[in-house]
């Protein structure tokens, strides 16, 4: 069973979208499981998990001692596992950018221990002491790491064996082999005077594969060009 444990100041956020559709069914089948550790219950001072930053500046910083209490508590969820095979992730805007390749690597682990940041950030000593892997889900800032934790968890969970109903769909989707996926069409054949491409109705599977490959390449180049322009 693949296990995910999330350290957060807002455990009520979870499971959220992780408990619907195919992921809910996979959890019922015990393919994976989820636990949360409430930071507010890991401090000796009532609901006090943060303090002012040394050196001044805006916002509040989550305390290292509170985080470590939560971290030790989170380890218990993995007591039957080799903890070395659990990826320990700190969600932060200054981490490596998460992508499909990262998800594939994480899916080969035994589980994930995810720490959600909040406020101005967390005490850097906690990250260094536990040798955490810093990960970001994009070049923007959120109010906290809870949304990012759900994004990473979902991307990883759907790669686990037997989670998707059709394993072939996983091999043909976007970002596999660094390619975006081809466009899809279904009934009706005509909608608002827009037609389904004839090749998809032809029954010629060789031509269909060729068309899909060409479209995937076209969209990949188009988006890469746009992303490159946005980064410049």
PLM feature spans:
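S-adenosyl-L-methionine/SAH cofactor-binding core of RNA-modifying enzymes
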Residues: 61-118
């Amino acid at each position: 069973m693949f296990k995910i444990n999330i350290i957060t100041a807002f455990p009520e956020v979870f499971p959220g979208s992780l408990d619907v559709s195919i992921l809910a069914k996979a959890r019922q089948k015990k393919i994976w499981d989820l636990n949360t550790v409430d930071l507010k219950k890991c401090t000796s001072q009532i609901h006090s998990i943060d303090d002012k930053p040394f050196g001044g500046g805006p916002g509040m910083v989550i305390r290292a001692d509170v985080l470590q209490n939560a971290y030790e508590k989170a380890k218990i969820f993995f007591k039957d596992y080799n903890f070395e095979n659990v990826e320990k992730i700190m969600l932060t805007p200054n981490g490596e950018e998460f992508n499909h390749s990262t998800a594939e690597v994480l899916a080969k682990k035994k589980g994930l221990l995810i720490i959600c940041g909040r406020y101005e950030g967390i005490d850097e000593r906690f990250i260094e002491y536990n040798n955490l892997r810093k990960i970001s889900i994009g070049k923007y800032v959120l109010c906290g790491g809870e949304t990012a934790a759900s994004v990473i968890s979902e991307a990883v969970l759907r790669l686990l064996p037997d989670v998707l109903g059709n394993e072939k769909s996983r091999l043909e989707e976007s970002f596999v082999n660094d390619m975006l996926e081809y466009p899809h069409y279904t009934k009706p054949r005509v909608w608002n005077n827009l037609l389904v491409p004839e090749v998809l109705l032809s029954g010629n599977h060789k031509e269909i594969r060729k068309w899909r490959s060409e479209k995937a390449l076209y969209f990949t180049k188009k988006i890469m060009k746009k992303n490159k322009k946005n980064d410049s």
